[in-house]
Amino acid sequence: MGFCFSKFGKSQTHEIPISSSSDSSPPHHYQPLPKPTVSQGQTSNPTSNPQPKPKPAPPPPPSTSSGSQIGPILNRPMIDLSALYDLHKELGRGQFGITYKCTDKSNGREYACKSISKRKLIRRKDIEDVRREVMILQHLTGQPNIVEFRGAYEDKDNLHLVMELCSGGELFDRIIKKGSYSEKEAANIFRQIVNVVHVCHFMGVVHRDLKPENFLLVSNEEDSPIKATDFGLSVFIEEGKVYRDIVGSAYYVAPEVLHRNYGKEIDVWSAGVMLYILLSGVPPFWGETEKTIFEAILEGKLDLETSPWPTISESAKDLIRKMLIRDPKKRITAAEALEHPWMTDTKISDKPINSAVLVRMKQFRAMNKLKKLALKVIAENLSEEEIKGLKQTFKNMDTDESGTITFDELRNGLHRLGSKLTESEIKQLMEAADVDKSGTIDYIEFVTATMHRHRLEKEENLIEAFKYFDKDRSGFITRDELKHSMTEYGMGDDATIDEVINDVDTDNDGRINYEEFVAMMRKGTTDSDPKLIR
């Protein structure tokens, strides 16, 4: 028989049956949750709008004159967004800005644009938070369950973040509309959620605000994938650092957050709360106010006995228990959760997934050799802040802590990210990234091969890379300068030099000027280029 939880607010009176055990199990009801949040500044997510297919490649950044004003947020020349995109209807509004639907003027494709008012970024911390959000979006884009980031643009009044438009609405809105689903369907949804946590942690990011509202459906199709959005509270993981600020949304906050002493394990807790809600319709710890919710979380009484739990599999309940263990050191990891029997026994699709790291390495393999060396120069000059996430990814792959990644470590690391590449394909990636042909990938080579191509938007990075080759500061890279620089890496043979010059020297004067160099570096910089994804 059905039942209804009305403790979430007197205004919610409708009952929606959801079958969560098997197709024949008795239905239970999903009661929409109120949204008490701990932190401010959350922007609303886009709702139903058409989603273009296939996924487009970003246009090259618009040219800017040397006299362009440098924006204080992004530290690069300011750009008039209206030259690139038309803004349309408002999709959501938050403390700092507004999200609009927008259209790319070059091809008519639709995206979401989060416009943040610079005058509302009063504190230095506000600016640092926005910069970090941009860096994390750049770092994580390309993952199958993370919203695609198109670019960040700054003008006199606003910072604009352009990203994929997810037109299917919020995850739980879809569940409410559907009315019922099976435990198997819940597992299919939940695997995507846990995969986001796993990939974030593997790539050195803790989300800190996982909740159903931050997962959107790509389209209105029945089998639409879901995407994680809103990384405004996310941070790069710093080895040994303990976080003390209370962030997140009340129902999903881990107990150690309330104790102001936590790490990445809080994301697993939040995901566990989401699974509990998926299977029961209510959160495990509830209250009428934030205070009473927090008290329930700290008290920690987990109910897996009363209805509907007798109809739900022991395997599902075992996973919930392991994700909601109060001691974060004993809590299951996201990687372990993905291997839990409840996740693996439901015959979820085994379709290969291309991780962002893998896609970038495939791109890198396709680049000409001058571009590879130039990227290495850029990588060597990036700040610790800019490569924080990649540093953690490298450490996760370098399992023997030797300071280099072997073929076996690369293969195992890509496998943990969901790759199904063959031995020969991984060998090709290895050879492409191993610039000095040592047989292993060192830290700089790894950063070179996997850093996000948004780094190429920074003029100062391109200038420094050009100077590395232009030894006499003539404004041109001559054949001799090219040969000298490339010989250091065993690439200085005449055939390679001819190949590079023929590819880059578009005005056929036998040398490479700065404009030709920049065009080469910015060519094909999307992480979603279908030609580079197998």
Curated annotation (Swiss-Prot):
Which annotated residues bind Ca(2+) 1? 398, 400, 402, 404, 409
Task: Give the Enzyme Commission number.
Answer: 2.7.11.1
Q: Give one GO molecular function term.
A: protein serine kinase activity
Q: Cite the active-site annotation.
A: 209
Annotated binding of ATP, by residue: 91-99, 114
Post-translational modification Phosphoserine, affected residues = 249
Q: Which CDD domains match?
A: EFh, STKc_CAMK
Q: How does it sit in the membrane?
A: Lipid-anchor
Residues in domain EF-hand?
385-420, 421-456, 457-492, 493-527
Q: What is its main location?
A: membrane
Q: What class of enzyme is it?
A: transferase
Going by the UniProt record, its keywords in alphabetical order are: ATP-binding, Calcium, Kinase, Lipoprotein, Membrane, Metal-binding, Myristate, Nucleotide-binding, Phosphoprotein, Repeat, Serine/threonine-protein kinase, Transferase
Binding of Ca(2+) 2, residues:
434, 436, 438, 440, 445
UniProt lists compositionally biased (Low complexity) regions at 16-27
User: What InterPro entries does the annotation carry?
Assistant: CDPK_Ser/Thr_kinases, EF-hand-dom_pair, EF_Hand_1_Ca_BS, EF_hand_dom, Kinase-like_dom_sf, Prot_kinase_dom, Protein_kinase_ATP_BS, Ser/Thr_kinase_AS
What do the Gene Ontology cellular component annotations say? cytoplasm; mitochondrion; nucleus; plasma membrane
Q: Output the PANTHER family linked to this UniProt entry.
A: SERINE/THREONINE-PROTEIN KINASE
Family, according to the entry, reads as follows: Belongs to the protein kinase superfamily. Ser/Thr protein kinase family. CDPK subfamily.
Please quote what the entry notes about the protein's domains.
There are 3 contiguous domains conserved in the CDPK subfamily: a kinase domain, an autoinhibitory (junction) domain and a calmodulin-like domain. The autoinhibitory domain (348-378) inactivates kinase activity under calcium-free conditions.
What's this protein's function?
May play a role in signal transduction pathways that involve calcium as a second messenger.
Q: What is this protein called?
A: Calcium-dependent protein kinase 29
Q: Which organism is it from?
A: Arabidopsis thaliana
Which gene produces this protein? CPK29
